[in-house]
């Protein structure tokens, strides 16, 4: 190799007896190599010279001494780290800043570990257990009561009410009648079997009936119009000699004047006002 062949490719200075760098079969003095080829450090913005270690992550470069956690500033050299929003964080800082806390043990749920979510809270998989049997619930069905979560078998064993009709567990809601509880969809009219949830109803011998069935089967009938006398919503009725009338139906059988609060006479089965009953063969 001649002396000219041992010169810096860029500045042509002789490299005899000097340090140099060989790149792509070309020789460079240290000064030229650093100026032309050095990467710039993400942290300090200075060139990473040939005598320094260049640490690279996703086409970004750092001096070894600048490769630190963005929050606690501890070195990340040969340590696990996480990149978030262009920042490098050690696992401890990432966990404190970005990870969820377990609702049960209050410890950090580490990135990459499995976590369970329920009603906006998070648990370690091993902390998300049935309040009674302490077995992991995982993705199985569960029922919440007060501050605890229960697997279905434990909840049914400890707390559940059973429907008076179908004898199955009532997990939520329900209707109570005569100290018994029903599913909403099981509380039916004893006559026509329609659902009574959010409906007015009457009872007979401890059996519930919708108003139509109760009136048809059990309500007294008006002696005038023959329609049921329900007594609902404060309705008034008149009773005389085992007969009943709606107050608006208690009228003179001849002139139809109201007899409510008035004296009246009877003729056979007919009710008459005093005027119409005068001179007739009547009973007082």
UniProtKB/Swiss-Prot annotation:
Select a single GO molecular function from the record's annotations and give it: transcription coactivator activity
Major localization listed first in the record, in broad terms: nucleus
Q: Which CDD domains match?
A: LIM1_FHL, LIM2_FHL5, LIM4_FHL
Write the record's keywords in alphabetical order, separated by commas: LIM domain, Metal-binding, Nucleus, Repeat, Zinc, Zinc-finger
Q: Where are the zinc fingers (C4-type)?
A: 8-32
| Cellular-component GO terms for this entry | nucleus; Z disc
Does Kinase count among this protein's keywords? no
Q: Which GO terms describe its biological process?
A: positive regulation of transcription by RNA polymerase II
Disulfide connectivity for this sequence is: none
InterPro entries registered for this protein in UniProt: FHL5_LIM2, LIM_FHL1/2/3/5_N, Znf_LIM
| LIM zinc-binding domain span | 39-100, 101-160, 161-220, 221-283
Q: Which Pfam families match?
A: LIM (PF00412), LIM_FHL2-3_N (PF25076)
Query: Where found, per UniProt?
Result: Nucleus
Binding partners and assembly? Interacts with CREM (via the third LIM domain). Interacts (via second LIM domain) with SPAG8.
Q: What does this protein do?
A: May be involved in the regulation of spermatogenesis. Stimulates CREM transcriptional activity in a phosphorylation-independent manner.
Q: What name does UniProt use for this protein? A: Four and a half LIM domains protein 5
């Amino acid at each position: 190799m001649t002396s000219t062949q041992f010169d810096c490719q860029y500045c042509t200075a002789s490299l005899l007896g000097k340090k140099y760098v060989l790149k792509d079969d070309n020789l460079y003095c240290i000064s030229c190599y650093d100026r032309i080829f050095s990467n710039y450090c993400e942290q300090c913005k200075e060139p990473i010279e040939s005598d320094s270690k260049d640490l690279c992550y996703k086409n970004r470069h750092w001096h070894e001494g600048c490769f630190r956690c963005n929050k606690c500033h501890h070195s990340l050299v040969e340590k696990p780290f996480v990149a978030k929003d262009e920042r490098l964080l050690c696992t401890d800082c990432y966990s404190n800043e970005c990870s969820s806390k377990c609702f049960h043990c209050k410890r950090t749920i580490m990135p990459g570990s499995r976590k369970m979510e329920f009603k906006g809270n998070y648990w370690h998989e091993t902390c998300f257990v049935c309040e009674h049997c302490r077995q992991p619930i995982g993705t199985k069905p569960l029922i919440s009561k007060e501050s605890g979560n229960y697997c279905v078998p434990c909840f049914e064993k400890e707390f559940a009410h059973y429907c008076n009709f179908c004898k199955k567990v009532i997990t939520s809601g329900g209707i109570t009648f005569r100290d018994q509880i029903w599913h909403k969809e099981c509380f039916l009219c004893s006559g026509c079997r329609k659902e009574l949830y959010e409906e007015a109803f009457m009872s007979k011998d401890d059996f519930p009936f919708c108003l139509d069935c109760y009136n048809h089967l059990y309500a007294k009938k008006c002696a005038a119009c023959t329609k049921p006398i329900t007594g609902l919503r404060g309705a008034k009725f008149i009773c005389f000699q085992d007969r009943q009338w709606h107050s608006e139906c208690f009228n003179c059988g001849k002139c139809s004047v109201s007899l409510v609060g008035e004296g009246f006479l009877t003729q056979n089965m007919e009710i008459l006002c005093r005027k119409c009953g005068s001179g007739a063969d009547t009973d007082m």
